[in-house]
UniProtKB/Swiss-Prot annotation:
Subcellular location: Endoplasmic reticulum membrane; Lysosome membrane; Endosome membrane; Golgi apparatus membrane
Entry domain remark: The RING-CH-type zinc finger domain is required for E3 ligase activity.
Residue sites binding Zn(2+) 2 per the record: C80, C82, C106, C109
Membrane topology qualifier: Multi-pass membrane protein
UniProt-recorded name of the protein: E3 ubiquitin-protein ligase MARCHF2
Alphabetized UniProt keyword annotations: Cell membrane, Cytoplasm, Endocytosis, Endoplasmic reticulum, Endosome, Golgi apparatus, Lysosome, Membrane, Metal-binding, Transferase, Transmembrane, Transmembrane helix, Ubl conjugation pathway, Zinc, Zinc-finger
EC number(s) reported in the record: 2.3.2.27
Gene3D superfamilies: Zinc/RING finger domain, C3HC4 (zinc finger)
Known partners and oligomeric status: Interacts with STX6; the interaction promotes MARCHF2-mediated ubiquitination and degradation of CFTR. Interacts with MARCHF3. Interacts with GOPC/CAL; the interaction leads to CFTR ubiquitination and degradation. Interacts with CFTR; the interaction leads to CFTR ubiqtuitination and degradation. Interacts (via PDZ domain) with DLG1 (via PDZ domains); the interaction leads to DLG1 ubiqtuitination and degradation. Interacts with ERGIC3. Interacts with ADRB2.
């Protein structure tokens, strides 16, 4: 996780209010001087969420340690051994984090999650906004393949027709040269096609291995709610005790 100019594990926040990289984002929110400005990113640098928490905004309950939102739209879970504010997380946020980081354990307490991984399809790889150089190379290779394939076929056919004509005229040396040229042409074409195909297959296989769809295996929905209720009660009690009357 990258937080401003600092690096922390998911769920931790650092004071980056003086960072010039986020000054425009802070001014646009209208929250005044921020207490925390945090960006949650995956290992490959993709931004997962940006969080700005103001000094005047008190914490009125548990929130997700990844997206830093409460349990308004989705219930919070405590699937690992983390306690306190780091123990609550949305199921969808955790699944997205595990998929982006290509891990199956909590990076704080190292608890192994029961997950189900499913590989992504070829169309998802083509639509993925990954490195532009890979997509550009793929487009260039496809265009070259569509252009070179008919060109190689026509050139080989013309060379063989010329070799037949020279054989009728008893010009064996010229016919042998045209046959050798045809063999060399098709050898180069086949080698280039195989190398390009293998290169892109390796890229696709690596992408599928590191970008799998992760589904967190929990018990029943009722147990998820009961699993979180002690955590929520403890946090609310702690906040109530620390709040001056």
């Amino acid at each position: 996780m990258t937080t401003g100019d600092c690096c922390h594990l998911p769920g931790s926040l650092c004071d980056c209010s003086d960072s010039p990289a986020f000054s425009k984002v802070v001014e646009a929110t209208g929250l005044g001087p921020p207490q925390y400005v945090a960006q949650v990113t995956s290992r490959d640098g993709r931004l997962l969420s940006t969080v700005i928490r103001a000094l005047e905004t008190p914490s009125d309950g548990p929130f997700c340690r990844i997206c830093h939102e409460g349990a308004n739209g989705e219930s919070l879970l405590s699937p690992c051994g983390c306690s306190g504010t780091l123990g609550a997380v949305h199921k969808s946020c955790l699944e997205r984090w595990l998929s982006s980081s290509n891990t199956s354990y909590c990076e704080l307490c190292h608890t192994e999650f029961a997950v189900e991984k499913r590989s992504r399809s070829l169309t998802e790889w083509l639509k993925d906004p990954g490195p532009r150089t890979e997509k550009r190379t793929l487009c260039c290779d496809v265009v070259c393949f569509l252009f070179i394939t008919p060109l190689a076929a026509i050139s080989g056919w013309l060379c063989l027709r010329g070799a037949q004509d020279h054989l009728r005229l008893h010009s064996h040396l010229e016919a042998l040269g045209l046959i050798a040229l045809t063999i060399a042409l098709f050898t180069i074409y086949v080698l280039w096609t195989l190398v390009s195909f293998r290169y892109h297959c390796q890229l696709y296989s690596e992408w599928r291995r590191t970008n799998q769809k992760v589904r967190l295996k929990m018990q029943a929905d009722g147990s998820e709610g009961s699993q979180h209720s002690p955590l929520a009660a403890g946090l609310l009690k702690k906040v109530a005790e620390e709040t001056p009357v």
